[in-house]
């Protein structure tokens, strides 16, 4: 975890220094998206082979209950006694915008699902980002109550399975369709059949962005699972290859390196 918000920098250096380590970074909605927000987005875009677990309880827990970057608008806390004016971040949407190669979401009380997401993250070659909804029973108790309550969670959670239709509900009789370019919740068995339901494709970044926006709308279920997964070269692998190429080059002095490219050549390159 390191000091507040700086875990991505330490994790990146650790991975470069010892590539064989399985590096896991634990952060929260406060340090991850405020003081450490710049570090987190660059970790994601660089695609280090590092696993990120972001515990989101929509509050600053360690610093005694101030509102966080994911607190809902209107949230009353010690630091916002009249209600927060800020629009909250959507963590998975932010991770996708930072070009994360693996973006998933789960919740603390769904233990089997949490375990499966951790396994998937471990198996991914690149930066894996898991948002984990976590209840803070001191400063924000019940923040995710409708998603964990036995009587309501079936109608509020959409479990994503790659290649499977997006269905949910106690009777598995609700699903997601595209109405033009917009998602829509429908009931299966009347006007719509299972064949009309949108099928999840975790390699589709446009679909992942659409799903990440469900969080902002009460009439849509909360998607849990792998929203997006793609393979591309990792920063640590590219660095190792670059260092290998460098070692093959003739030995140079500092003056040789400084004079290797002329100022005139640089200016010409910039003009082009």
Language-model regions, residue ranges each:
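Thiamine diphosphate
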Residues: 1-61, 115
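Conserved thiamine diphosphate
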Residues: 20, 68-121
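Acidic, Ser/Thr-rich peripheral helices and adjacent loops at domain boundaries
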Residues: 71-81, 148-162, 246-252
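Structural signature of the thiamine diphosphate
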Residues: 97-147, 212-234, 240
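Internal helical hairpin/lid segments
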Residues: 132-224
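ATP/nucleoside-binding phosphotransfer catalytic cores, i.e., glycine-rich phosphate-binding loops
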Residues: 196-263
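Conserved small/polar residues in nucleotide/adenosyl-binding loops
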Residues: 264-271
């Amino acid at each position: 975890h390191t000091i507040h918000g700086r875990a991505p920098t330490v994790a990146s250096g650790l991975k470069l220094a010892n590539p064989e380590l399985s590096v896991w970074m634990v952060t929260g909605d406060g340090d991850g998206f405020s003081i450490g927000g710049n570090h987190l987005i660059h970790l994601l875009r660089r695609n280090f082979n590092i696993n990120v677990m972001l515990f989101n309880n929509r509050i600053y827990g360690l610093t005694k209950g101030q509102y966080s970057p994911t607190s809902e608008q209107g949230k009353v806390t010690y630091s916002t006694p009249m209600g927060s004016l800020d629009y909250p971040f959507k963590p998975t949407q932010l991770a996708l915008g930072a070009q994360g190669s693996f973006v998933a979401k789960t919740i603390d009380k769904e233990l089997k699902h949490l375990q499966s997401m951790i396994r998937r993250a471990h198996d991914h070659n690149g930066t894996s980002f898991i948002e984990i909804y976590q209840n803070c029973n001191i400063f924000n108790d019940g923040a995710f109550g409708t998603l964990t309550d036995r009587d309501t969670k079936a109608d509020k959670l959409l479990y994503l399975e790659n290649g499977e239709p997006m269905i949910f509900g106690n009777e598995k009789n609700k699903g997601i369709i595209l109405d033009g370019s917009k998602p829509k919740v429908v009931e299966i068995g009347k006007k719509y059949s299972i064949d009309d339901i949108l099928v999840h494709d975790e390699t589709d970044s446009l679909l992942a962005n659409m799903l990440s926006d469900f969080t902002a709308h009460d009439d849509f279920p909360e998607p849990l699972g792998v929203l997006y997964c793609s393979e591309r070269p990792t920063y640590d692998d590219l660095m190792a290859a670059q260092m290998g190429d460098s070692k093959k080059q003739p030995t140079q002095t500092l003056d040789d390196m400084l004079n290797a490219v002329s100022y005139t050549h640089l200016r010409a390159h910039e003009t082009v």
